[in-house]
Swiss-Prot record:
Function of the molecule: Catalyzes the reversible isomerization-deamination of glucosamine 6-phosphate (GlcN6P) to form fructose 6-phosphate (Fru6P) and ammonium ion.
Assembly behavior: Homohexamer.
GO molecular function, one term: identical protein binding
Protein name in the entry: Glucosamine-6-phosphate deaminase
SUPFAM superfamilies listed in its UniProt record: NagB/RpiA/CoA transferase-like
PANTHER family in the cross-refs: GLUCOSAMINE-6-PHOSPHATE ISOMERASE
Keywords: Allosteric enzyme, Carbohydrate metabolism, Hydrolase
GO CC terms in record: cytoplasm
Superkingdom as given in the UniProt entry: Bacteria
Record EC number: 3.5.99.6
Keyword Acetylation (UniProt): no
Length: 266
């Protein structure tokens, strides 16, 4: 596992965006051989999306031959609801780059048959072989996507009941009213995420410090689903200083020295 310890959340966004752009450019995608990118929603990746848009506008990366798969979607709110993850992605990213509509893949939280929708999504991912890079965030309790504590580490795309903690955390997007936050969501599984060629998790803020500690220094544990990254051959965690508060000083020092060349300029 790689750990990229940076000072501020804005630096996390810029580093992650530069990493994605480099991966896309090195891949040299074409219509027949697209780069497949997994994407999250939430507050943490906003800085990354902003930086990616800037790189696109500067002509440093193109999304013309990039296929995307999002991590999750709420069940029971309209697709055009301002807080649906579909709306989030178009507002904060898709509307600002040259991605083709046909290359955007999102879970349908209003599908009549949720299990069939989850299987369709898994099959669509497999049709591309694999996801080349999956970017994600992490919850205060260590969940990745909506794989809440005690989720199977081999789980696939499925329906999940959201914990009260997650709904409280997400209520900030619903005028602070937990009753407006959906109770269920469709989400990729931990196993789905681990199938990706590379996984990059963004961690910012002191409230994520325990989750980062569990991911880096803890044991692999289904109560902290982010810890499953330890099983991945190509995992990278990009974090800011406040989120590093629970890590041992020697851990941060070790990775700071190891990644010194990759941190330069950020």
């Amino acid at each position: 596992m790689r750990l990229i310890p940076l000072a501020q959340a804005a630096q996390v966004g810029k580093w992650a965006a530069a990493h994605i752009a480099k991966r896309i450019n090195d891949f040299k995608p074409t219509a027949e051989r697209p780069f497949v990118l997994g994407l999250p929603t939430g507050g943490t990746p906003l800085a990354t999306y902003k930086a990616l848009i800037e790189l696109y506008q500067a002509g440093e990366v193109s999304f013309e031959h990039v296929v995307t798969f999002n991590m999750d979607e709420y069940i029971g709110i309209p697709a055009d609801h301002p807080e649906s993850y579909r709306s989030f992605m178009y507002t904060n990213f898709f509307n600002h780059v040259n991605i083709q509509e046909a290359n955007i893949n999102l879970l349908n939280g209003n599908a009549e048959d949720h299990e069939a929708e989850c299987q369709r999504y898994e099959d669509k991912i497999k049709s591309y072989g694999k996801i080349n890079l999956f970017m994600g965030g992490v919850g205060n309790d260590g969940h990745i996507a909506f794989n809440e504590p005690a989720s199977s580490l081999s789980s696939r795309t499925r329906i999940k009941t959201l914990t009260e903690d997650t709904r409280i955390a997400n209520s900030r997007f619903f005028d602070g009213d937990i009753n407006q936050v959906p109770k269920y969501a469709l989400t990729i599984g931990v196993g789905t995420l681990l199938d990706a060629e590379e996984v990059m998790i963004l961690v910012t803020g002191h409230n994520k410090a325990l989750a980062l500690e569990a991911a880096v220094e803890g044991s692999v544990n289904h109560l902290w689903t982010v810890s499953a990254l330890q099983l991945h051959p190509k995992a990278v965690i990009v974090c800011d200083e406040p989120s590093q508060q629970e890590l041992k000083v020697k851990t941060v020092k070790y990775f700071s020295e190891l990644e010194a060349e990759n941190i330069k300029g950020f």
